[in-house]
């Protein structure tokens, strides 16, 4: 089967048609909020390309890239990489709360923590410490960005979320400046 696929790819390439396989690893947020639209346009333009997608946390995707299990990785953060690397976007993290809680001191209502990778957790913890909020214990720990947004939307607390997920959020958002 692999030889048959390679032969077909060679024939198509000899006819100047773009084909083959691309093994793409994408961070969860990019895969959820941006990749479907991009992937649709790509596969419409290059229907002979077999696109294989793996999603996960950036650290895991970087390991897959190092083991040649994926060809390209769209990841958050900086990793020691000797080959081609390109910054494709940059986005802030945001403090989010419901409109009813806007302007209220953050110490007066619950902080909603979100499970994320260790690098981002460390950045969030540094921001909390720099703003005298390190002593705050999350009242909830949530795995899902969408669940965090809903908790915040209903006024159950405030959270720190990436801008990428906030297009449909109708509450208060404030860009945060964090060490990178």
Give the label of every model feature segment:
Residues 82-87, 91, 150-180:
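Beta-alpha-beta core module
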